[in-house]
Amino acid sequence: MDFLERICPSVAQLQETDLWIDAKGSTPSDARLLLATAEDKNYETQVEVNVGKGNTAGLLLYYSEKAYAGVVSDGKNFIIYKKRGKQLYPPNKLGKRFLAKIQNQGNSVRLAVSKDGKEWTTLVENMDVSQLHHNNYGGFYALRIGLLSLGKGSAGFRQFRYRNAIPKEKDMGAYLMVFHKDETHSLYMAVSDDGYTFTALNDGKPVIAGDTIALQKGIRDPHIFRGPDGAFYLSMTDLHIYAQKDGFRDTEWERDGKEYGWGNKPRTRTDEIVGLINWKRTNARFDLLSAGLGEIGCVWAPEVTYDDKKGKPMIYFTMRFKNEANKLYYVYVNDDFDRIETLPQILFEYPNEKNIAIDGDITKVGDRYRMFYVSHDGGAGIKQAVSDRINGDYEYDPRWYDFEPRACEAPNLWKRIGEDKWVLMYDVYGINPHNFAFIETSDFVNFKNLGRFNEGVMKTTNFSSPKHGAVIHLTKEEAARLRSHWENRK
């Protein structure tokens, strides 16, 4: 990485392995700073700090003189700068020489310190720095990494390190499942260390209540995706199918059910999750994208993926016009994940136009894209279509892949960490109580039936009757932070 500010020899000297920077000012606003631009959305940076006499020094994320966050020390106490000028002053038990680390995971920051680089003490975690930008503080700067020296004397820095912190499969050690429930129309999360036994966070209660985020006062069909930038992207259907009964509207559906069909609504939700704790939210109105979309009957089950050729996030979903057949469509989204940039295009439609295809789920396996979806060809079940490109040309396969005699929907494919095994999960809604079922494969030809939750090897510990789920990998550290966050809220 390149340093943006060259410090002249009169204020900085290299002595053996330490860079000594003369101090100035009394706050980060007027201190001496050596700045560098981070090249990644998810990264980790650290430096060894040597605090001189009368000096305060440390490691910051710096947008401008009014907007910064990080940790510094005078040798006696740490000073933690949080957004909007908030400060904390925990005691410094490490002395004047210490290591400072910043982990920035999509604008969710962890600050940690260490004496030896082996044992780290977390000072702050899940600190949201997403608001440190030009809309709030003017200018058009980047949120830069800064070495700070203020007060008197000088500060020494050595062993500055920076690395891309987007985890690979080898770094993963846990699984995260998202789902909703019919009785609450809210978002739930469950975590598993082995991919077999899942425990819901927040004691099995919603992590986000649907009536706090959805225009219809309920959400369905949550899906979560980790992008190539390391950020987590969540999408949900803005729909409450019992809204009239629960007193949220006067009619069964938002519009005439005979004309626009079951579950009609023109909206969905697109959310970027910052570090799995903090959220940036957007309600997407597909009916307002163009005059021709004013008569759409539904936008259901949105999922997010990434088109490597386009270099853009892609949302795909079930859509229909009025009460016509449901088909699968896609759109592209801007990099900030808050604006749809294209009009819906056909992704896949069932060869028999009288039947429908819904609930598409795309996964790249090798060089091909495998899309499992729900076919209503006689009954509701799971089929697969395969393509060499992500946004079309999916080949119809007449085979039914689920093992269920009853209706099922919401397929989701996920890989077992470190194994050449893939699990296809789906929602068996045709039974009472409904449940998830699972099959497993290594070649996508032969599938092993793993059964339903709590009827075979797949288990839940504190929840039942989940609806429309999705699973992704987490690192052990991410899983621990997520568990800790919800346990500490009790």
Segments from the language model and where they lie:
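Extracellular glycan-recognition regions
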Residues: M1-D171, V471, E487-R489
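Entry beta-strands of beta-propeller and related beta-repeat scaffolds
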Residues: D171-L176, G230-L234, K310-I315, R368-R370, ...
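Structural motif
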Residues: T184-A190, A243-R249, E259-R269, E324-V331, ...
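Surface loop/turn signatures of beta-propeller and other carbohydrate-active proteins
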Residues: Q87-K93, T122-G146, I166-G173, F179-H180, ...
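Active-site neighborhood of glycoside hydrolase catalytic domains
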Residues: D307, V333, Y373, D377-G379, ...
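Conserved Ser/Thr-centered positions that define the repeating blades of beta-propeller domains
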Residues: L111-S114, S192, T270-L276, V331-N334, ...
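Residue-level signature of beta-propeller blades and closely related beta-rich strand-turn architectures
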Residues: K181, D238-H240, M319-F321, S375-D377, ...
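Loop/turn-rich, solvent-exposed surfaces of beta-rich toroidal or solenoidal domains
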Residues: D377-Q384, R389-N391, Y401-A437
